[in-house]
């Protein structure tokens, strides 16, 4: 070890007796400081303008344009300048012969050289660390462990670059060639992860070799053993190759022996890398303050209940618009989207089944008129150069699974302990399911589901249609991730006039019947309520009399006419509601609604008699005067203003009572439109939040899965504008000048000697 340290010390002296080391240090210092403090300055100005800050540590250091993310993209440019002369300088000057003929072991020479460059790279990390220290005094409650995780990841990355540069320096006596060769190898390692991803086994090898994004997890606050070991193994590989290369100059070796040594090293490194990257052997350390990179507590409680094999099968329709997400070349990325779960469930098995069938990909059919599904599939295989072991025809896939209800879209099934559920892709920017959707699917396999049944037969709102007034978006839209069918609920319909309510029903919804309920329907609903089951009743001013036999049983009624308010911008029946004050949280827990919840044409809820239900208003009209009027008026007339008005009229009420050992829950609303397709899609509305809270309550807070995390505490820049500016100047100008002065002093002093 002493020899290694002596060589490292000598190499460091040589490096710092060259202007290159000082210039690189100055450029790195200016570049990193400029990036960080320029961003900090912009956020400080935004904060002064009243913009809320959130999670500032992650925003400034990671993300799309944080300090560590940006510097990761530039580190590869610095390393070749530092490593190009490590060995090539010795080869060019002839001193390599003296080294090889000395009693010093080759491994000591190589390790000493690597230790020197690794020591120099610590200066890069020291600069980033100083920026982190300054951030500690600028940001309230800076997440220190998060910053340290990022620095650790970047250090491993730059040391791996250095090991590669060291090996390339062994191959040539020309320093420029060594630098260029290093850049070429680094580019290759960044690109190799995209090669041959459609070939089994080979794709795992190339994916392992890829250095692209390897430090991302650590930059984002998650230290993963397979990434740490990757950097160590790749560094070991190139250090070993460097030792073998220099040994050929000292020892006479046959070609076969050389090949065997190189092959053995490469195979050993690849084997170790493959083994240690498997899920059961991967370990994690979440360095974020709020464990952002780990499953939430609710999700962890779900996965704890899974103790056996679990299989995820992705059915990929070649004609679907999302087909590429399940192709062989995308599978490694697809596996990565389940990393949070494989951490706790290493036994997850993922399979892919490919088929073709009629799809909803309208553009594909427009662009290829006259081709049937089989011809389209053949064309896709040919033009996209897709190679599949098996592509099922419509007839063949239908024998395996019926995907017609899923519109033949790319979809997954999750199977555990004999139960199966769907996990879908969605028509939004991200497409893939997130923790909320994945955990909901898993919970359906280990816990009872919540079944919502809609009453039909009296022209009620439909969960199958897309019109503005219908209910498909919130309940039964498979392409919308927030629809309840994708959040753990089962949704069905029955003809209430002819069919009994299923025994397993958890919530019965009667939404705006436009004709009178039959006596049979009234009796069925009455018996259902008497059993202590949950109900949601939604009426409209013109048709709510159809619900009177039910609401009367509950001791409630509707106002006789539509509620209206005077407004300069909206129609009179456009009501801006308010969440009722002081709602008892033991009755229902509502999240804070940040946006108004509009009601377009609503009746008020009245109490007609005392019952054993506890009645809790949830939404009311605001504090403006409200009158009753016939529907369809264009303005509030002077005559109407003379009529008695009211304020804070209940529009949605919750009824609760203890029965059969559990709490019965009922919602009655004077407006059936407020959870319609159109209203749930309205921008700037709090309707969807309220809608979700209500059904979370109905499910006893089991679904949707609560994936909220503790609020971040690093939400404020505590440094003033002047302090940020002074710190910026210190790091961008004064600190680099000090480095230049130190470098100049050392270089001049050496020249004088």
List each language-model region with its residue ranges.
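Pore- or pathway-lining transmembrane helices of multi-pass membrane proteins that form conduits
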Residues: 20-30, 175-190
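Terminal transmembrane helical anchor/hairpin motif
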Residues: 39-62, 178-252, 618, 633
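Transmembrane helix boundary and interhelical loop/hinge segments in multi-pass membrane proteins
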Residues: 80-100, 114
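Juxtamembrane extramembrane loops of integral membrane proteins
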Residues: 278-416, 422-431, 435-441, 449-500, ...
